[in-house]
C-alpha cells in the first residue's frame, strides 16, 4: 500500500482541484468552485478503487478544507459534496479554528 503525507497533496488553483496521484497514475481528487458571492464551494470528491478504504479520502478532505478555509478567511467555504459533509460532521473537532466553514 502506498503512503501519503501533506506533501503528496497537490493544489491546482487553475482547475480548482486538490489531488493525490497514485503510482498507477490514478488520482483521488476534490473539486471546488470559487463563486462570485465570496464563497468557495467544495462540490465533488472522487477516490479511485485502489484508494478506497485506505483513509486517503479523509486525508484529502481534511487538507483541502483546512487549506481553503485558512487561505480565504474572508470567504465562506461551503461543503456541498455529501462525502465532505459526512467527513466534516464526523471530524468537526479538527475544524474548530475555522469559523468560515458551512454546510450547503
Roles of regions detected by a PLM:
Residues 66-82:
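Conserved GNAT acetyl-CoA-binding A-motif
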